[in-house]
Amino acid sequence: MKRIAIAIDRVDWHARRLHAAFLALDMAPRFVSLRTVAFTPEGLRFPGLEGLPDAVFVRAIAAGSFEEVTRRLGILHALAARGVAVWNSARAIERCVDKSMTAFLLAAAGIPTPETWTVEGREAAAAVVLQAATELVLKPLFGAQGRGLQRIRVPEDLPPPEAVAGVYHLQRFVPPAGEDGFCDYRLLMCRGEMVAAMARRSAEWVTNLHRGARPAAFAPTPEMMALAARAAAAVGADYAGVDLIGAADGRILVLEVNSMPGWRGLQSVAEGSIAAILARRLVA
């Protein structure tokens, strides 16, 4: 019986469904907080576990100091070095948590994405705003769930450095392609295949479910599925939430790639259990 560690600090809706999905596969799942895993002279020590798990599903990494987060990512690196399957790998998580690296890798792979700049200091950011000569979106470099987004039209709109930890991550704003309000798309990808998809519609420009957007069933085109698969591969993710948006010129652009995506909204419009699909593919 394979032992599966579900890495999470607070057991949430997703973790409970993953646990049930692994049980249904006759696996032995357990919740593990990475903060409790230790580096020892003998190697990694998991509390209450003899040896190492057979696989690790990283549902979330808790916030902490730079040193704490670095150590937790180090645990994932060490597990992979010992041959343990880790979803997602520390490398993929590092690439996706840092939005500037995600944007760089997408562009390097030739994947269409809104023009993006990441600079330090308000003066450098102001120069970007003037150079772009169009509306931009300021995003936290480390951020999720639509928090902290701000539209920037002129340099005076830029917040002070202390409000953004000194880093300005600016992406060209993509206006609505149609007349039905704001809409983008989330595709959940796993090993190059789509697991589920939804459209997110909102009267506001931030189309995040945590900000009031509404999920809707959606059948993506082959082009969209191929683009999402390429985006997940570009960051090295085994599974990922890929956000797409339609531009006014008809192009489909990749906005972001999430290496620890939630799927509660997706599950509300999807057929079958998403957790069951992910669990089955991890242990395949």
Question: Model-predicted segments: where are they?
Answer:
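Extreme N-terminal starter segment of soluble prokaryotic enzymes
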Residues: 1-5
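Conserved N-proximal alpha/beta basic substrate-recognition cap immediately N-terminal to
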Residues: 9-115
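Short acidic-glycine loop/turn motifs at beta-strand connectors
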Residues: 26, 189-193, 247-250
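Rossmann-like NAD(P)H-binding beta-loop-alpha module
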Residues: 109-133
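Protein kinase-like catalytic core scaffold
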Residues: 136, 195-196, 240, 253-256
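Phosphate-binding site of ATP-dependent enzymes
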Residues: 145-232
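A long amphipathic alpha-helix within ATP-dependent nucleotide-binding catalytic cores
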Residues: 205-254, 265, 276-284
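Glycine-rich phosphate/pyrophosphate-binding beta-alpha loops
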Residues: 258-270
